[in-house]
Amino acid sequence: MSEEDIRAARLEKVEQLKQLGTNPYAYRWESTHHAAQLQEKFADLTSGEEVETEVAIAGRIMARRVFGKLAFFTLEDETGTIQLYLEKNRIQESMAEIDANAFNHLKQLTDVGDILGAKGTIKRTEKGELSVYVKEYTILTKSLLPLPDKWHGLTDVAKRYRQRYVDLIVNPEVRQTFRRRAQITAGIRRYLEQRDFLEIETPVLQSEAGGADARPFVTYHNTLEMELYLRIATELHLKRLIVGGFEKVFELGRIFRNEGISTRHNPEFTSIEVYQAYADYNDMMALTEGIITTVAQDVLGTLQITYQGETVDLTPPWRRVTMHDLVKEYTGLDFHSFQTLEEAKSAGKNAGIPGVDEAQTIGKILNLAFEEKVETKLIQPTFVIDYPVEISPLAKPHRSQPGLVERFELFIVGRETANSFSELTDPIDQRERLEAQAAKKAAGDLEAQGVDEDFLTALEYGMPPTGGLGIGIDRLVMLLTDSASIRDVIAFPLLKPEGSFIKAYRYEPTTQTLTLEFDSGSIYEYFKVPLTVKEELDNAPSKGQYFHKFIKGQFKYEQLS
């Protein structure tokens, strides 16, 4: 049967239930146990043994085996599964006053996917299956759409993300991933709160996007008649709180960056930023180790983990090594020895480092060498310390290494997991760096930061020495759940709508008809479309975006298929 036929048949069952006086969409149900509790409590029950303990349970029917006077359902709730042992005579006797044909209606009107409540006692069948020996049942929710027969496999990845609710129903391990994610974030908050850190919320809508080199999402406030940005970091507002007298603050929340999508990047992601007055990046390294090892031990019960086939030992202390030393270790290039930009460029080219020609400083080339030749090789936890000043506009100058800043990034399994500075507190130096960033922004660098005058004003009131830390929550969850893609740890990752890709189009100038074929197979014909619109569509860098903005809703149309 097609999905449409199945849905029609189930709608008919909904009507039959209503005719029987049964509401197929109940209001509530009182359970006494979850499946896992019953499995644990009665684990020692022997085959054929029954106890008279009355229980009530609810869940989704995941499997049905129906015989003449007997049926077996597999019921699944949030904690696991348990079998329902359904015997005609027992159910008919218990439910005689409610429904004289209760057992037959159970057989005829329920389907896999329905949500069922059941009351009864506990028994273990002769085959050893712990079961609820049902006396009464209630259909709590009638499912209209069938669950997929086969959901695993790469061919279904996009659908799993797009219909996460179905993914969660049929894949218990996916539910476990998000349960662990919740445990991880709760553990991080608990660790910090136990050390007197205070979580304070900062604005998501901001008049100046700052705190990171990233392209922001832009929106508009109608009442205030002003352009606003979704935050790309929480840094600058948390630092304002440090200026205001708080000594330990953090925020765990959503960040938005209008950038590419990959297995490691999602435009909307979660991070935590932590700031501590009178601390530096050495203190932040200790804090980072403490947070991650404590959470890993609490959630997984071990510091020895496996990620995509790689064994990772999270036992502290973690390696601490400078970017210069790592680049020298993996490429043989000693960037301390280069006296001129041309010398560094020549060495970089010979080492096969891409993008060297566009680099304007030795520090930029050093960073390119690190990203190209080193980053992916850092499998075990490694603090990469002391970065070039050119790529760290918010970090304090290194106290003993000119041209460098006191910054570290934590790499695990070849990915940046955390970023930290001894924060820049000199307002004059900070202004110079932000103005240099603003010049790049004016020249077309979409990721460069602007000048946040209010933040600079705050610094001029005086910010104490401060250590700052940012941890990517999604990447940390990926690590601790052995998830290959960031989309596996975000419940509802951003996806392009199905059918939004324009596969082909043609234009008939005599009738001004524009025919569009989408990747979903749908074909639409739009009428009285000026030639100029078709020409603009030809030249649009994103035809789907142009369609949604300038064609959809602007012209009359007819769907051909």
UniProtKB/Swiss-Prot annotation:
SUPFAM superfamilies: Class II aaRS and biotin synthetases, Nucleic acid-binding proteins
Transmembrane segments: none
Enzyme class: ligase
Ligand binding (Mg(2+) 1): E409, E416
Database matches in PANTHER family: LYSINE--TRNA LIGASE, CHLOROPLASTIC_MITOCHONDRIAL, LYSYL-TRNA SYNTHETASE
Stored Pfam families: KTSC (PF13619), tRNA-synt_2 (PF00152), tRNA_anti-codon (PF01336)
Documented EC number(s): 6.1.1.6
InterPro entries named among the record's database cross-references: Aa-tRNA-synt_II, aa-tRNA-synth_II, aa-tRNA-synth_II/BPL/LPL, KTSC_dom, Lys-tRNA-ligase_II, Lys-tRNA-ligase_II_bac/euk, Lys-tRNA-ligase_II_N, Lys-tRNA-synth_II_C
Assembly: Homodimer.
Protein name, entry field: Lysine--tRNA ligase
Cofactor detail note: Binds 3 Mg(2+) ions per subunit.
Gene Ontology BP term (one): lysyl-tRNA aminoacylation
Record: residues binding Mg(2+) 2: E416
Subcellular location as annotated: Cytoplasm
